[in-house]
Swiss-Prot record:
GO biological process: translation
GO molecular function, one term: structural constituent of ribosome
Protein family per UniProt: Belongs to the universal ribosomal protein uL29 family.
Organism: Hyphomonas neptunium (strain ATCC 15444)
Domain of life: Bacteria
Lineage, uppermost ranks: Bacteria, Pseudomonadati, Pseudomonadota, Alphaproteobacteria, Hyphomonadales
HAMAP family: Ribosomal_uL29
Name this polypeptide is given: Large ribosomal subunit protein uL29
Length: 65
């Protein structure tokens, strides 16, 4: 996910995206623990996407003040 794509979304969309990414991260963690995870790089990718979304949400909340 590109930062430009994240910035173009509304706060509600970003919140929904954050929930979706956290669920995916949870599932990936379980797959890794049970040895079923094939794409190990996806864990890092999802973690960074979560950080990106949180950063943009914080920027948008600070801009509103």
């Amino acid at each position: 996910m590109k930062a430009a794509d994240v910035r173009s979304k509304s706060v509600d969309q970003l919140s929904d995206e954050l929930v979706k990414l956290k669920k995916e991260q949870f599932n990936l963690r379980f797959q890794a623990a049970t040895g079923q995870l094939e794409k190990t790089g996806r864990v890092t990718e999802v973690r960074r996407d979560i950080a990106r979304v949180k950063t943009i949400l914080r920027e948008k909340s600070q801009a509103g003040k």
